[in-house]
Regions:
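Ligand-binding loop in jelly-roll beta-barrel domains
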Residues: 87-115
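Short acidic-glycine-tyrosine-enriched beta hairpin
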Residues: 33, 69-95
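Residue-level recognition of well-ordered beta-strand positions that form the cores
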Residues: 41-43, 67, 104
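Short glycine/proline-enriched turns and hinge-like loops at secondary-structure junctions
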Residues: 36-37, 54-56, 75, 95-97
Length: 151
């Protein structure tokens, strides 16, 4: 089997803060290295704004609860909404309510997200290795914080 699942029930996986302010927390549910597919839950506090970033992979998002405003397309997504972001979709999202979202990333390479400045220069990235490190951290007691950037 190519897919690795977290060795704990989802309810027992600790939320892992992935930004300095702890506005974004994640649980890696599964990771398939060969197909480069990652499934996660994100818990994001109201007021968080992603800034411009580009998904270099296909991304499916389902809003379990909360609300997201996509500044790039001027669209709000709320509880029960599904959103598909094609590979190389660049956008800027703001979480207007505390939100819980399910995300499925499917990439053609090890790069998933590029974080951009206002001139679209790449400032940081989110890679398969970051997700692997997150899964390892969440599989252990205490869940130490790994070094991935925000989402």
């Amino acid at each position: 089997m190519n897919t690795q699942f977290n060795n704990k029930k989802t309810s027992q996986i600790s939320w892992l803060a992935i930004d300095q302010e702890e506005k974004i927390k994640a649980k890696v549910l599964s990771l398939n290295r060969s197909d480069r597919i990652v499934e996660l839950l994100f818990k994001i506090k109201a007021g968080y704004r992603s800034g411009p970033h580009r998904h270099t992979c296909e991304t499916s998002v389902y809003v379990i609860n909360g609300e997201i405003f996509n500044h790039s397309i001027k669209e709000t997504f709320g509880q029960g909404d599904y959103c598909f972001q094609a590979s190389n979709d660049t956008h800027d999202e703001e979480f207007t309510k505390n939100s819980l979202i399910y995300v499925n990333y499917k990439s053609k390479n090890d790069l998933f997200v590029e974080f951009l400045d206002e001139e679209s220069n790449v400032l940081d990235t989110l890679t398969l290795q970051h997700f692997e490190e997150m899964m390892v951290a969440q599989s252990k007691e205490g869940s130490p914080k790994p070094p991935p950037p925000g989402v």
